[in-house]
């Protein structure tokens, strides 16, 4: 077990973000795999499975990096982690807030907070 002082941040696995060539086509294909469409914008989509696991679909020219998304339960957790990582928090158009940082092997990790009224 890691010492608390060594902990960068923690969260539960929420989603992965992958590149896709054709957003509309890939949304349809993930629906055929049992995913539902949660969010659709011109530049990305979020699909969720029955347990709530998400796949963010990013067109090749997306400003978002491929990444692992970890969810925190409170804004205070997000703020504390962002301070430890020395990263700015960005509020998003869907009401969430997050920051990106480097994870294991240099892969991007997004730490994200969903407010209580998300999706309502």
Residue ranges, per PLM feature:
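Short, composition-biased local secondary-structure segments
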Residues: 1-3, 48, 74
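Vicinal oxygen chelate
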Residues: 1-9, 12-21, 60-120
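A short, compositionally biased micro-patch
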Residues: 23, 40, 50, 75, ...
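Core segments of cupin and vicinal oxygen chelate
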Residues: 8-11, 17-54
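Short amphipathic alpha-helices in soluble, non-transmembrane regions
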Residues: 31-32, 81-85
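Conserved short beta-strand elements that form part of the metal-binding/catalytic scaffold
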Residues: 35-66, 108-116
